[in-house]
Amino acid sequence: MRVTHLSLTDFRNYGTAEVHFEAGANLFVGRNGQGKTNLVESLGYLSALGSHRVSSDQAMIRQGAELAVVRARIQHEARELLVEVQLNRGAANRAQVNRAAIKPRELPRYFSSVLFAPEDLALVRGEPGVRRRFLDQLLIQRNPRLSAVIAEYERVLKQRNTLLKSARASRFREDQLGTLDIWDDRLLTLGAELINARLDLMARLSNPLVAAYRSVAGDDHHPRLLPQLTISGAHVEDEDDDSVADMTSAFGDTTDVFRQALAGVRWKELERGLTLVGPHRDDVLFELNGLPAKGYASHGESWSFALALKLASAELLRRESVTGDPVLILDDVFAELDWARRRMLATTVAGYEQVLITAAVYEDVPAELAAHTIRIEAGAIVEPS
């Protein structure tokens, strides 16, 4: 899979932009603040349904405009698609494929990309919510149906929290507790599906992560992903490397465990007016050489871990997708690497059908990734060099 053309209207600092892409490596060069990251952010949005920089879509609409449009022409072998999303200030977003309307959450069915940016260091050093979003975005790319599951879980969670607060205020009336049981059943069904999907994903990422870390760092530091589930009260720490492939069974039947966990915290939840266990509060422990990467890994090791996670994601998508490789996006990555690691990364990504790279300094990028270079100046596309 690759992008052949990108059109932007009122997206970030671009009033309009038309960009042609080649197969293989495409390098965007420009000083900081010129708009090169905005270009790749727009493509990342099409597959992740969100920005890697901001939580609100509104920030991506150009100041003074009411809507922004991202339109990309996608090619897979002989098949060509026109994929479009419209971001609206005062209404729901809209999406199209070949001019036919679709739900925005269906976009990952048609375009797949993996983006790595400096902000991804937060995967290792940031809060649990960052790691949950990483897993869920990858889940949706692998199976877009899960977008609806996640959205429905969040809706049910919100309703349940509202009911818990109401029950607390009315001193736990019997009729409200009965209604809570109904919401519990829905929360259990959706939550167990999401937990199991995350566990399966972590298991599948295990081997690609080890290989990717070695390819970008040259070290055998054995990175691992260990689930920390609030419904279990503990996380798996089995020293057997193969145990990651059987994470789900380590917790027993997820729905039953979740049900028992909810029962165990029922009165605490009523006192606090908050759902205390479930996938919305889970975390993933990133481990390097048997130690938590957060707090123990150096800056370079943390950077390598985050980059390896994204490369492992790309490898997993390329193995499973019938549409070929995801488009690999490396946003301002090479500036953080020494020359040896730049060479290693260039070798690692060389086999992908298309790689999009941004850099402030042309010389930071190995020559084999700079054959098709586009310069960006003040939100304007300069002819390829």
Curated annotation (Swiss-Prot):
Pfam families per UniProt: SMC_N (PF02463)
One GO BP: double-strand break repair
MF (Gene Ontology): ATP binding; single-stranded DNA binding
Top-level taxon of the source organism: Bacteria
Keyword annotations from UniProtKB, A to Z: ATP-binding, Cytoplasm, DNA damage, DNA repair, DNA replication, DNA-binding, Nucleotide-binding, SOS response
Gene Ontology CC terms, in alphabetical order: cytoplasm
Compartments reported by the entry: Cytoplasm
Keyword Repeat found: no
Role, per record: The RecF protein is involved in DNA metabolism; it is required for DNA replication and normal SOS inducibility. RecF binds preferentially to single-stranded, linear DNA. It also seems to bind ATP.
Family: Belongs to the RecF family.
Protein name per Swiss-Prot or TrEMBL: DNA replication and repair protein RecF
Species assigned in the record: Leifsonia xyli subsp. xyli (strain CTCB07)
Gene name tied to this protein: recF
